[in-house]
Amino acid sequence: MSGSPVKRQRMESALDQLKQFTTVVADTGDFNAIDEYKPQDATTNPSLILAAAQMPAYQELVEEALAYGKRLGGSQEEQVTNAVDKLFVLFGAEILKKIPGRVSTEVDARLSFDRDAMVARARRLIELYKEAGVSKDRVLIKLASTWEGIQAGKELEEQHGIHCNMTLLFSFAQAVACAEAGVTLISPFVGRILDWHVANTDQKSYEPLEDPGVKSVTKIYNYYKKFGYKTIVMGASFRNTGEIKALAGCDFLTISPQLLGELLKDTSKLVPMLSAKAAQASPLEKVHLDEKAFRWLHNEDRMAVEKLSDGIRKFAADAVKLERMLTERMFSTENGK
């Protein structure tokens, strides 16, 4: 019998091992899929909410959001906008019942180049959370990492005490600007960087440590730790568990339920690949970026320019689809409501 604890330890899942050196976050709007993985936090985005809003299990939330939009009145457009904001918050509030940490809720990607509009929309979302009995300490507002988005994040953090998660982050320039803005958390993307390299270069597969997305997040993590930035680095957008394992030790990693499931079944040994101590030895030098320098440095990275604009377009398109779906249900005469 004495050998059993050792055996049990050896059979520990990769997910449980990962949790020893990284905060695990669930990347989904489908909160019924969260329970078995016991994540600390959760992240949502317009695409994930759109997918969840079409599932039968969540129709009560959709109905509640529609009723809220109608109750507030105004033009058709205003009613739909209010219903969308309410829907995002309803999903977030339900997710928070299942996790001990924070949920990330995204500001409409169509506002990505309008600093003031992003600030106003973020404050509105926090107000809706407050009405739902959720403190702003449990919410991260997601903003696209454009120059305007990063400055909106700085303003929200400094003037309103609202925590921000800077998303669609593909370039080192974006990461430096976010660090200087003092935002709570960044979401550098991994899988979408890999996608770009597979589509635009001759190399079609990569070992995890050579994966360009993994290398990007590793560089950003090392830079933040070497120069003492408090901003949390949360790797996001994974295509396989190899990428996740190659970033073990990163502050946070946000992972889809499908890949969380694969990690739960995986019993191979996991070792931390990133550490604040090792980061001190990295050869990176400190950089300061004003707006002009940021725009130039970001523009020099073709992959990042293309993936940021592509990401904004995709999230905006899904926001339009969600609005269309809610508009049909709110105002179609066939609905009978």
Curated annotation (Swiss-Prot):
Reaction equations catalysed: D-sedoheptulose 7-phosphate + D-glyceraldehyde 3-phosphate = D-erythrose 4-phosphate + beta-D-fructose 6-phosphate
Cellular compartments per GO CC: cytoplasm; nucleus
GO molecular function, one term: identical protein binding
Subcellular location: Nucleus; Cytoplasm
Alphabetized SUPFAM superfamilies for the sequence: Aldolase
Major location category of this protein: nucleus
Involved pathway(s): Carbohydrate degradation; pentose phosphate pathway; D-glyceraldehyde 3-phosphate and beta-D-fructose 6-phosphate from D-ribose 5-phosphate and D-xylulose 5-phosphate (non-oxidative stage): step 2/3
GO biological process: carbohydrate metabolic process; pentose-phosphate shunt; pentose-phosphate shunt, non-oxidative branch
Catalytic activity, EC: 2.2.1.2
Residues where Phosphoserine is found: S237, S256
Modified residues (N6-acetyllysine): K219, K269, K286, K321
Catalytic residues in the record: K142 (schiff-base intermediate with substrate)
Location of the motif Nuclear localization signal: 1-10
UniProt entry keywords in alphabetical sequence: Acetylation, Cytoplasm, Nucleus, Pentose shunt, Phosphoprotein, Schiff base, Transferase
HAMAP family: Transaldolase_1
Known role: Catalyzes the rate-limiting step of the non-oxidative phase in the pentose phosphate pathway. Catalyzes the reversible conversion of sedheptulose-7-phosphate and D-glyceraldehyde 3-phosphate into erythrose-4-phosphate and beta-D-fructose 6-phosphate.
Similarity section: Belongs to the transaldolase family. Type 1 subfamily.
Swiss-Prot/TrEMBL domain comment: The first 10 amino acids are essential for nuclear localization.
Oligomeric and partner information: Homodimer. Interacts with KPNA1 and KPNA4.
Identification of the protein by name: Transaldolase
Organism: Sus scrofa (Pig)
